[in-house]
Design a protein with these regions (language model features):
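C-terminal glycine/acidic-rich active-site capping loop/insertion
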Residues: 58, 62-90, 95, 99-102, ...
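Beta-strand scaffold of nucleotide-dependent catalytic cores
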Residues: 5-8, 57, 107-110, 134-135
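Adenylate-forming
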Residues: 18-20, 119-122
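Secondary-structure transition into beta-strands, especially the periplasmic turns and strand N-termini
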Residues: 51-53, 99-104
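Predominantly a Rossmann-like dinucleotide-binding segment in NAD(P)-dependent oxidoreductases
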Residues: 1-86
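Glycine-rich phosphate/pyrophosphate-binding beta-alpha loops
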Residues: 109-117
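Glycine/small-residue-rich pyrophosphate-binding loop that anchors the diphosphate of NDP-sugar donors
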Residues: 33, 37, 94-96, 104
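Short, well-ordered coil/turn segments that N-cap beta-strands
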Residues: 2-6, 92, 102-106
Length: 170
């Protein structure tokens, strides 16, 4: 269906989503959204791309917005350990390109705080025969009988935090 998967993009971005508490303290957490959120999309993409080994990484991190605890929003991520004296010295945005031993490349972005429209999580895989996007629904892009095709697959939500646990609860 996909042929040789040679490129992938994955994002796990929050507009205002630092949970506070130990999550923002680098000595206790080890880092920000890359370690908290990004590892999951890296793991999933590596699995979907065939489990190849990384051979090089280029990355950049930013701490420009902080945890923005003073800003009110509809969605708020709060750790039970959050207090009025939280430290925030981790990145609020991380971006990287990972090259694998088969030549494929994965581009990732993970944020606790980013000036975007809304929180988003997307995974896209691009192969020599077709591509797929989980956003949160699953859409296949390819060709059929000489025509470019987009096929939206009728599945339960593929990449939704709430959707991930709905089946476990029901």
């Amino acid at each position: 269906y996909f042929g040789d998967i040679y490129y992938a993009k994955a994002t796990y971005l929050r507009r205002k989503g630092c949970p506070g508490g130990w999550f923002g303290d680098k000595t206790r957490s080890g880092g920000g959204p890359l370690i908290d959120l990004g590892v999951h999309i890296i793991d999933l993409c590596r699995y979907l791309m065939g489990g190849h080994q990384p051979v090089s990484v280029y990355g950049a991190t930013f701490n420009k917005l902080g945890d923005r605890h003073e800003i009110k929003s509809e969605v708020d991520y709060k750790s039970d350990s959050r207090s009025g004296h939280d430290i925030f010295n981790v990145e609020d945005l991380a971006s990287a390109m990972i090259r694998f031993d088969n030549g494929a490349v994965l581009q990732i972005e993970a944020s606790f705080s980013l000036n975007i429209e809304k929180d988003t999580g997307t995974i896209e895989l691009f192969g020599s025969k077709g591509g797929v996007k989980l956003d949160p629904d699953l859409t296949y892009y390819g060709e059929m009988d000489g025509y470019m095709t987009d096929v939206k697959l009728a599945t339960q939500t593929a990449l939704s935090f709430d959707g991930l646990f709905a089946n476990e609860i029901n």
